[in-house]
Amino acid sequence: MRPIVINGTVLCDPITGIPRYVYEVVTRLDPLLTGTGLDVRLCYRDDGRPLHLPELKNIRIVPLKAIKYSYNLVVLPHYLRRHKAFFLGLASDMLMTRRSAVVLHDIRPLVMDTDRGFFRFKFWVHCLSIKAFARRVYTVSGDQRRLISERLGIPLDRIGLTYNGWEHLQ
């Protein structure tokens, strides 16, 4: 069976915003995998920072050695190809593989003039890689879904919705 690989590098950062979303999804997914036989792995860039996760029973943690910018562009794609894995990017991940689904939380840097020029350019390249490679894109609201379709030219039928944060409003 083809493994499913989640990029967990953001779980080395403080657990707020997008890392919080990834944390919540991974910790809730782990017990649901019991008895399914699915091979789910969480890969992360092992640069000495701790991974902020409780012990997982059904998701295998895979540290990958890499320098900062080579992880997403070289090391992780190589790992995915070598293991013929399906990639699940929960944190607006840049990717270079066709067997993938990505959550693109928002495209704020492309629609608002609040970020530095280089960051906006880098984010644009990032979004183009998602458009070119992701089999399916998910986002967090209907408005973002429409914006992603309009600005990036991704057909609406390739963009799904995954709402986040509802449990924090209770």
Where are the regions that the model predicts?
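Carbohydrate transferase catalytic cores enriched for Leloir-type hexosyltransferases
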Residues: 1-170
